[in-house]
């Protein structure tokens, strides 16, 4: 266990950030699953918001930039193929 006040605060803030990151990542994953299961009209409506969510994760370094680019490409191709 940490002995310094700053180390204790860092532990608390890291846990808060970890929970926030997990929530955002899980929410985005659920949105991606819904998009993949949706019909064409519904999927086309959802695509911009899902892409925005993926971009926000990449911007906050929750996922890598290349993973975000790959996801956006896959989702766009999936919706176009419906």
Curated annotation (Swiss-Prot):
* Domain of life assignment: Bacteria
Q: Which UniProt keywords apply?
A: Ribonucleoprotein, Ribosomal protein, RNA-binding, rRNA-binding
Database matches in InterPro entries: Ribosomal_bS20, Ribosomal_bS20_sf
Q: Which Pfam families match?
A: Ribosomal_S20p
Gene Ontology process terms (BP): translation
Compositional bias segments (type: Basic residues) = 1-11
GO MF terms listed in the record are:
small ribosomal subunit rRNA binding; structural constituent of ribosome
- Residue numbers spanned by region Disordered: 1-20
Gene Ontology CC terms, in alphabetical order = cytosol; small ribosomal subunit
Coiled-coil residues: none
Protein family membership: Belongs to the bacterial ribosomal protein bS20 family.
- Which NCBIfam families does the entry mention? S20
Q: What does this protein do?
A: Binds directly to 16S ribosomal RNA.
The molecule here is called Small ribosomal subunit protein bS20
